[in-house]
Curated annotation (Swiss-Prot):
GO molecular-function terms, A-Z: growth factor activity; nerve growth factor receptor binding
Protein's GO biological process: cell surface receptor protein tyrosine kinase signaling pathway; modulation of chemical synaptic transmission; negative regulation of neuron apoptotic process; nerve development; nerve growth factor signaling pathway; neuron projection morphogenesis
Region of interest (Disordered), ranges: 62-86
Record keywords: Cleavage on pair of basic residues, Disulfide bond, Glycoprotein, Growth factor, Secreted, Signal
Taxonomic source organism: Felis catus (Cat)
Basic and acidic residues: compositionally biased ranges: 67-79
A GO CC term assigned to this protein in UniProt: synaptic vesicle
Alphabetical list of PROSITE patterns matching this protein: NGF_1, NGF_2
Residues that carry a glycan: N131
Cysteines paired by S-S bonds: C152-C217, C195-C246, C205-C248
Propeptide: 19-138
Secretion signal span: 1-18
Free-text function comment from the UniProt entry: Seems to promote the survival of visceral and proprioceptive sensory neurons.
Protein name: Neurotrophin-3
Length: 257
């Protein structure tokens, strides 16, 4: 296409020169030489362009081909959001802010006090924190109104040796005890609340009419996020059940209205 354009342009230029009687026409050899040079330049340009394309294709062919994402076949488990145990890193620990619960603590030392949200509970602490715990108990008793009693007696404590739990799917999972993070490993601690006894009084819960009702104190559970592994393979944050309160369960006695 470029060669044809050059020929047409030169023919047009020569026609203009022929009409101009005041100027001498170019010699025939000079015009032919100009046409040959233009054709050679165009051929060289096309040749260089083709060489550049070949080089680009050869370079791309040497690069490793990226594999397209493979769809899981029928019966094959989908990709899990949990990581293998060998691949666990600090990213899981960074997610604690998003999954944090006041009842779950990651620390390199055993906690001596209850979480700030649960200072008013009957905390069972270690002897080191006995004085501070007793002060908080006196403060809680001072704030309560005289003559008020709980239906059930409960106690709260930091569980330091939790090894297994039931997750939200009903599967038993392993609770990670020690987690390697940098130079100092951290452990998981769970602040749990449970009933001291099923029957604080002879016939059941305190203050319940035992003529018409059967009553019993039962420990209630709720879900919190914790670092766990399933089948000792996949590590991640899962919802697990822990003891969080003590409630009074009632049932009407048969034959009573």
């Amino acid at each position: 296409m470029s060669i044809l354009f050059y020929v047409i342009f030169l023919a047009y230029l020569r026609g203009i020169q022929g009409n101009n009687m005041d100027q001498r026409s170019l010699p025939e050899d000079s015009l032919n030489s100009l046409i040959i040079k233009l054709i050679q330049a165009d051929i060289l340009k096309n040749k260089l362009s083709k060489q550049m394309v070949d080089l680009k294709e050869n370079y791309q062919s040497t690069l490793p081909k990226a594999e397209a994402p493979r769809e899981p076949e029928q019966g094959e488990p989908a990709k899990s959001e949990f990581q293998p145990v060998t691949a666990m890193d600090t990213e899981l620990l960074r997610q604690q802010r998003r999954y944090s619960s006041p009842r779950v603590l990651l620390s390199d030392s055993t906690p001596l006090e209850p979480p700030p949200l649960y200072l008013m509970e009957d905390y069972v602490g270690s002897p080191v924190a006995a004085n501070r715990t007793s002060r908080r108990k006196r403060y809680a008793e001072h704030k309560s109104h005289r003559g008020e009693y709980s239906l059930c007696d409960s106690e709260s404590l930091w569980v330091t040796d939790k090894s297994s739990a039931i997750d939200i799917r009903g599967h038993q999972v392993t609770v990670l005890g020690e987690i390697k993070s940098g130079n100092s490993p951290v452990k998981q601690y769970f602040y749990e609340t449970r009933c001291k006894e099923a029957r604080p009084v002879k016939n059941g819960c305190r203050g319940i009419d035992d003529k018409h009702w059967n009553s019993q104190c039962k420990t209630s559970q709720t879900y919190v996020r914790a670092l766990t592994s399933e089948n000792n393979k996949l590590v991640g944050w899962r919802w697990i059940r822990i003891d969080t309160s003590c409630v009074c369960a009632l049932s009407r006695k048969i034959g009573r209205t």
